[in-house]
Design a protein with these regions (language model features):
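Transmembrane alpha-helical segments of polytopic membrane transport and secretion proteins
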Residues: 1-61, 146-149, 333-342
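A structural signal for multi-pass alpha-helical bundles of membrane permease subunits
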Residues: 51-342
């Protein structure tokens, strides 16, 4: 009798285990959308082509983007990297000179070193400040009533719609070197200065002025991504946080908003770094090119000088490669740091 009972118990356990396994398989198939798992007997290429064919409509829809990306971004980058090892003046046949462009760039070209220091100075200030300001103002907009948010968003975002040249023209009036400039006029009337400040001619003022104008228009796509990120934060998290004793706005920012908007933080970091290292048109409009003692010279202006004025495409390509490596390296570092924090 005891043996029969054990056998019956074992049979019941087997049936239950089989049912659980079958149920798990059904759930796995449902989670996979009914798709078959990869057949590892096929080569990776065959499997890839098979998957592309099965999703041909999706690939057809994203094909225009990849075609434009390859044509206007990837191929020019490759061509620039190759031409950086040649002497090429756009007229004669390119001459292979190996590392000569890079040696001249870092050893003999004093203007590049000046442009490098100016660009780094600009990026170190504009990048972090605009990044933090974008997040702060997006958070501020999220605190105001819903009906007023579009108005505030447009007010903060509108300056970024202006091109660097257009902004420069407007701010030229503000920082004009004579008493007719708005800032000089206010300072003179207030008795704070006795003669106009040469904002656009004095070397010590040139880069600070460029930075101020750049920060005024720095709330761009990254700012909009932050606004969207705050909008998509699940409001139930705030209710749950109140139960746990998180009541102040600062606490909600630290424990809810920042973790929930981490994708936007990563996206904006890339945009901010790229934009802070590619300044050029704004500086040229405000202080001209060349600027007094090259105080407003940036890497982009130096690159444009060799590519568009001297037609030394090979050397300009070397400058572009160095700039690209800087942007990619710092962007990758920032991305990694934010991922670790998240």
């Amino acid at each position: 009798m005891g043996k029969n009972r054990k056998a019956l118990k074992k049979a019941e356990d087997t049936v239950v285990n089989d049912a659980q396994a079958a149920g798990q398989n059904v759930m796995d198939d449902a989670a996979d959308g009914g798709k078959k798992k990869r057949d590892y007997t096929k080569s990776y290429f065959s499997y890839t082509m098979h998957e592309i064919w099965n999703h041909k409509m999706s690939y057809a829809l994203i094909a225009p983007f990849f075609i434009c990306f390859i044509t206007f971004t990837l191929l020019p980058l490759i061509a620039s990297a190759v031409l950086s090892f040649f002497y090429f003046d756009s007229l004669s046949w390119p001459q292979f000179i190996f590392w000569d462009n890079y040696v001249y760039l870092f050893v003999e070209d004093s203007l590049f070193l000046k442009a490098f220091s100016n660009t780094l100075y600009y990026a170190v200030i504009v990048g972090p400040v605009s990044y933090i300001a974008s997040y702060f103002f997006a958070w501020f907009i999220n605190q105001v009533p819903t009906k007023l948010r579009p108005i505030y968003t447009l007010a903060f975002y509108a300056p970024s719609l202006c091109s660097g040249i257009a902004m420069g023209v407007v701010w030229l009036v503000m920082f004009a070197n004579d008493s007719q400039g708005y800032i000089n006029s206010v300072l003179l009337n207030a008795g704070l200065i006795t003669e106009p400040i040469q904002f656009l001619q004095d070397v010590k003022w040139i880069m600070p002025v460029i930075i101020i104008v750049a920060l005024w228009s720095s709330l761009g796509a990254g700012f909009l991504s932050f606004v969207a990120g705050f909008t998509n934060v699940d409001k139930e998290l705030y209710d749950a946080a109140m139960v746990d004793g998180i009541t102040s706005r600062f606490q909600r920012l630290i424990y809810i908003d920042i973790p929930q908007t981490m994708p936007q933080l990563l996206f904006s970091a890339v945009l901010t770094i790229t934009g802070s290292f590619t300044v050029g048109g704004l500086s040229q409009t405000l202080v001209g090119h060349p600027s007094p003692e090259d105080a407003g010279l940036t890497i982009m202006l130096h690159l444009g000088d060799y590519a568009g004025q001297r037609f030394e495409v090979g050397y300009a390509s070397a400058i572009a490669v160095v700039l690209s490596v800087m942007v990619l390296g710092i962007g990758r570092l920032a991305f990694k740091l934010l991922q670790e924090k998240g």
